[in-house]
Amino acid sequence: MSEPLFLNSVMQEKIWGGTKLRDEFGYDIPSEKIGEYWAISAHPNGVSKVANGRFEGTDLATLYAEHRELFGNRPEPVFPLLTKILDANDWLSVQVHPDDAYGLEHEGELGKTECWYIIAADEGSEIIYGHNAKSKEELRQQIEDKNWDALLTKVPVKAGDFFYVPSGTMHAIGAGILILETQQSSDTTYRVYDFDRKDDNGNLRELHLEKSIDVLNIGEPANSRPVTVKADDLSSTLLVSNDFFAVYKWEITGKVDFEKTADYSLLSVLAGQGKLTVDGKDYSIQKGSHFILPSDVEAWTLEGSDLELIVSHP
């Protein structure tokens, strides 16, 4: 019998983290500085484990390696995606991620293209999304001169906004923002600027200026243009589609039947509660639930009065 894969996952403590993962989602957090919940992950720095069914207790990396049929026997050698929720209680560093070629050559892992769905944002919250330098030479000079106000592009944000952040994009998440991030399964980050913060030992965190300059794009970031289709009890918005992933927002106000259109899908519930039905079996879902519908799930039903989900697939 086919079944969904619900997951138990890993909290990551961060210098900029807070308590919203507990306050908003009810997660049990181990400290007051939790910045990330790696909700669906097979990355070695934080691997999810299956919480139900015949694979209960198996980590996602092992499951992907040993049961590729559950993932459509796709060619990716490792599980390609990672879903996170980030609680930015303070600014994250200004940073950039490499593309696959640079990441594999210099770090031994994939690069990182990602995207952000803004779950919640305090009034006046901002992100850094791109920069104003017109050439690599100007970029280097502005960084060396620490001319951050002139260099960095700040954008105000609110709940429901979406940003596509391809590799090579200068970016930072600002204080007071809660984000669901869909990304390539990579943990490579090059810090450009960290607001001169010190860690618990009084040391400045490492910067990676030469690698950052190597990989930073020149020109404005290419954000996506979401497209919404409505039918009966479902509003489906395609947020972005590219070589790495497609990401949708589903808003469900009743009972909706689905048929498989991808080899497998990753689903995260951002609001509401309801039930998922697969092969005649009901599963309760609520805000904060994360699960995978593997390749052998050919059809399913979602039912709820005010469900909001982010759905992705490679």
What kind of feature is each model-predicted range?
Residues I118-L139, T237-L239, I252-D263:
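Short beta-strand/loop turn elements enriched in aromatics
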Residues P226-S289:
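Acidic/His-leaning functional-site neighborhoods
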Residues L152-Y164, L178, D279-V297:
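Short acidic-glycine-tyrosine-enriched beta hairpin
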Residues Q141-D149, Q273-K275:
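Short, structured beta-strand/loop micro-motifs enriched in basic residues and often containing a Trp
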Residues M1-K134, D194-A222, V247, E308:
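Transition-metal
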Residues D145-L151, F162-Y164, M170-P221:
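An exposed, glycine/acidic-rich loop-and-rim segment of catalytic or binding clefts
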Residues V78, L86-W91, D100, L110-G111, ...:
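Ligand-binding loop in jelly-roll beta-barrel domains
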Residues T83-K84, L92, E109, E114-Y117, ...:
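His/acidic/aromatic-lined binding-pocket segments of jelly-roll/cupin-type domains
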